[in-house]
Design a protein with these regions (language model features):
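Catalytic cores of RNA-modifying enzymes
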Residues: 1-164
Length: 164
């Protein structure tokens, strides 16, 4: 498995796939080696769980989730990341990526089709611009999840708390 927290590995993948970050999507990828294991731990990446991951980046958090959970289904809006994920996540048989917009995805149907007999949790490192809409959608929906674990920018957290 590639060390997706190593800046040289990331630079190599950026160059290999000609990938540039999209400001419109607010892309920011996790590279701190201590953060992803903690998010996975708090996000119920353990036996008996299916995890919905919102946004994958290059798969840094995805890999940590897939190490522990029975299944990880990632919803990734940027189709340019799919070939990168084929490379970085190829060793995980319990990982699946769906190229879709989380705000237009029927999560109840996804849970029924992908996580039969499993508890479900949601995990994400959310971009600033979509933090509030995604969190509100998850909280207001009727989806059967045990936990929602998201990492957000400090400013997004302050804005969200001010709205409540």
């Amino acid at each position: 498995m590639k060390n997706l927290t190593n800046i040289n590995v990331i630079k190599g993948l950026l160059e290999k796939y000609g990938f540039t970050f999209s400001k419109g999507l607010g892309q920011n990828f996790l590279i701190n080696p201590s953060v992803c294991p903690k998010i996975a731990e708090y996000g119920f990446a353990q036996k008996g769980y299916g995890i919905i991951e919102i946004g994958t980046g290059f798969g840094t958090l995805s890999a940590e989730l897939a190490k522990g959970a029975d299944k990880v289904v990632a919803i990734e809006i940027d189709s340019r990341l799919i070939p990168v994920l084929d490379e970085t996540m190829g060793e995980f048989d319990n990982f699946k990526v769906i190229n879709a917009d989380i705000m237009k995805t029927d999560l109840s149907a996804l849970i029924k089709s992908e996580f039969q007999g499993m508890k479900t949790a949601v995990c994400a490192n959310l971009p600033y611009y979509i933090t509030s809409p995604v969190i509100m959608m998850l909280l207001e929906s009727e989806i059967p999840v045990e936990a929602i674990t998201v990492m957000v920018q400090k400013e997004a957290a302050q804005r969200l708390c001010a709205k409540m």
